[in-house]
Amino acid sequence: MSTSISTTATPSTPGERAWALFQVLKSKELIPEGYVEQLTQLMAHDWSPENGARVVAKAWVDPQFRALLLKDGTAACAQFGYTGPQGEYIVALEDTPGVKNVIVCSLCSCTNWPVLGLPPEWYKGFEFRARLVREGRTVLRELGTELPSDTVIKVWDTSAESRYLVLPQRPEGSEHMSEEQLQQLVTKDVLIGVALPRVG
């Protein structure tokens, strides 16, 4: 007896698989109404490195806020409304003249979404995740950041308990700049710790 059932797998795109999974979960009422739309809004518009730039610039000009940020990063970011998934346990890492902090997620690609936005592609790559821990200075140099030989590089591995944000040193030449202008110096790479804020 012949059969018309094919034993050859039909390839599907990740988008098609995600849509099929979504439909199954929705049909079983396992996804709250509006959840996906809300998450899409957060990812597309609300989670952004500009949020982190506002936090850093505020810390540069406001000593009380800086102290709060270093004591309780979650509470400090919440003052701006930067909360939500991956932002429950925010820890600010303060750069000093002798210490440069860098963030990595050695197991996957977790970041502090509400303040850093979604991770860049290179951050998710195995090479970056594996090499940064072993040869941080070399990796930073390859990414365009040259540090003095006596600077200690501290690599912080993101976990379920901690989501990090680098608080860089305020750059020389920025003394005359307003808080809004200072925000423009802080990029996603600066917040991750692989770049330095620069004036001009």
UniProtKB/Swiss-Prot annotation:
<feature type="binding site">
    <location>
        <position position="109"/>
    </location>
    <ligand>
        <name>Fe(3+)</name>
    </ligand>
</feature>
<dbReference type="InterPro" id="IPR004232">
    <property type="entry name" value="CN_Hdrtase_a/SCN_Hdrlase_g"/>
</dbReference>
<dbReference type="InterPro" id="IPR018141">
    <property type="entry name" value="Nitrile_hydratase_asu"/>
</dbReference>
<comment type="function">
    <text>NHase catalyzes the hydration of various nitrile compounds to the corresponding amides. Industrial production of acrylamide is now being developed using some of the enzymes of this class.</text>
</comment>
<keyword id="KW-0456">Lyase</keyword>
<keyword id="KW-0558">Oxidation</keyword>
<dbReference type="InterPro" id="IPR023900">
    <property type="entry name" value="CN_Hdrtase_asu/SCN_Hdrlase_gsu"/>
</dbReference>
<keyword id="KW-0479">Metal-binding</keyword>
<comment type="subunit">
    <text>Heterodimer of an alpha and a beta chain.</text>
</comment>
<comment type="similarity">
    <text>Belongs to the nitrile hydratase subunit alpha family.</text>
</comment>
<feature type="modified residue" description="Cysteine sulfenic acid (-SOH)">
    <location>
        <position position="110"/>
    </location>
</feature>
<feature type="binding site">
    <location>
        <position position="108"/>
    </location>
    <ligand>
        <name>Fe(3+)</name>
    </ligand>
</feature>
<feature type="binding site">
    <location>
        <position position="110"/>
    </location>
    <ligand>
        <name>Fe(3+)</name>
    </ligand>
</feature>
<dbReference type="Pfam" id="PF02979">
    <property type="entry name" value="NHase_alpha"/>
</dbReference>
<keyword id="KW-0408">Iron</keyword>
<feature type="binding site">
    <location>
        <position position="105"/>
    </location>
    <ligand>
        <name>Fe(3+)</name>
    </ligand>
</feature>
<protein>
    <recommendedName>
        <fullName>Nitrile hydratase subunit alpha</fullName>
        <ecNumber>4.2.1.84</ecNumber>
    </recommendedName>
</protein>
<dbReference type="GO" id="GO:0018822">
    <property type="term" value="F:nitrile hydratase activity"/>
</dbReference>
<dbReference type="InterPro" id="IPR036648">
    <property type="entry name" value="CN_Hdrase_a/SCN_Hdrase_g_sf"/>
</dbReference>
<dbReference type="GO" id="GO:0046914">
    <property type="term" value="F:transition metal ion binding"/>
</dbReference>
<feature type="modified residue" description="Cysteine sulfinic acid (-SO2H)">
    <location>
        <position position="108"/>
    </location>
</feature>
